[in-house]
Amino acid sequence: MSNNQAFMELGWRNDVGSLAVKDQGMMSERARSDEDRLINGLKWGYGYFDHDQTDNYLQIVPEIHKEVENAKEDLLVVVPDEHSETDDHHHIKDFSERSDHRFYLRNKHENPKKRRIQVLSSDDESEEFTREVPSVTRKGSKRRRRDEKMSNKMRKLQQLVPNCHKTDKVSVLDKTIEYMKNLQLQLQMMSTVGVNPYFLPATLGFGMHNHMLTAMASAHGLNPANHMMPSPLIPALNWPLPPFTNISFPHSSSQSLFLTTSSPASSPQSLHGLVPYFPSFLDFSSHAMRRL
């Protein structure tokens, strides 16, 4: 009996030992399979697998493959423009073989409020990307064209206004307003004193209107301060205009360089539709000196 018991105890111990060895073997195999799974996942992430091993890998670690696909889908291509508020001047990645196609790589979950352009078709074989133009770029191009047109108009206005040497918009507009006020004052004074405004285009300098108005008023015996009334501009047909009869053209240098008439009678019907020109300061000053 004792021998049988000893033999049974020895067999039981052997069975327990074999079970322990089997458990250790299963644990080591499980650990090796976990390590292989992790290594295979890292290899898949870095592109070490061939196309023939794709099906086997998808059966081994499907979770890692999904994470890699989601990471690829979350990446967006950001093309900065000159009007963009974001300073994306780092993390440049070249997606094509040519070096001139450079885009900025970002994750779309990082800050969704910033402007980005999503890649619509990202084939590895294609060199160019089909992308959607944002509204910010379109607005920036429209604003640029509008600013260029405004700059051209301001340059033309600066050329029309005398003694306007500054190029900024505020200075040009101030000079233009002042110049238009001076022209309005000249028209009002001419209509008040009854001077014939039919002359050639004037050679008036900017700022010489005071001398001209003083000469006009002195020639007609009027006080300029008493006749500067804020009346509206009088049309050209209400002014006494000379007829077209007996118009003589001067030939000598001592005579006036403007048209003269022999009859001071007024005939507005003969000049219907014509716009009068501003008189010259030299003509008015010489006329005033002769009258004095």
From Swiss-Prot:
GO molecular function (one):
protein dimerization activity
Which superkingdom does the taxonomy of this entry point to?
Eukaryota
Which pairs are disulfide-linked?
none
Q: What is its main location?
A: nucleus
Region annotated Helix-loop-helix motif, chain positions: 148-183
- What phenotype is described for loss of this gene? Partially blind to far-red (FR). Impaired inhibition of hypocotyl elongation and cotyledons expansion under continuous FR light conditions.
Q: Where in the cell is it found?
A: Nucleus
Expression by tissue, per the entry, reads: Mainly expressed in fruits and flowers and, to a lower extent, in leaves, stems, seedlings and roots.
What processes in GO biological process is this protein linked to?
Answer: abscisic acid-activated signaling pathway; blue light signaling pathway; red, far-red light phototransduction; response to abscisic acid; response to far red light; response to heat; response to light intensity; response to salt
**UniProt region (Disordered), positions on chain:** 114-153
What's the name of the protein? Answer: Transcription factor HFR1
Q: Which gene encodes it?
A: HFR1
